[in-house]
Amino acid sequence: DNNMMKRYIIGICVCLAITLASAQTRREMGGIYHAYPKVDVKEMSQTPSGYKPFYISHYGRHGSRWMTSDERYIKVAQYFDDESNLTPMGLKVKKLIINARDNAMGHGGKLSKLGELQHKGIADRMYRNFPNIFAQGNSVQARSSVVDRCAKSMKAFIDELRHLQPSL
């Protein structure tokens, strides 16, 4: 019967929607606004017998950054302008938003401290896991686009390698 078929299709759609909705965590829903998680790899894959690592080619994106413009922080804060519409919790959130906005001013699109630490962490892990590649006498070549946050990400990476191996 036609009614039964409609119920069946609706049921399948609901089940599919529930399955898709559970495919990501609340934290992952932030998408590009969520910092990459720090992952501790306990054990790396072993180098195949008879081989020795000699080269790393690392293509990295800029680290975590402030939102693209100061205007975005201002716009979010404006939603809290009318305090008559805010609950006590809303007033607390407003203070946090205003503090975030004030801290962000002048940093729109720039690399954040977290972004710098992310690239230092990548360099540190490479150095610890492949010390022979960064041994005295070896060299590192680095290139970046002209975008400030990209150049500063590269600088953080290289600065950390130089800290670990001053002869680079």
Task: Show where each model-derived region lies.
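Non-catalytic terminal regions with compositionally biased, polar/charged low complexity
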Residues: 24-168
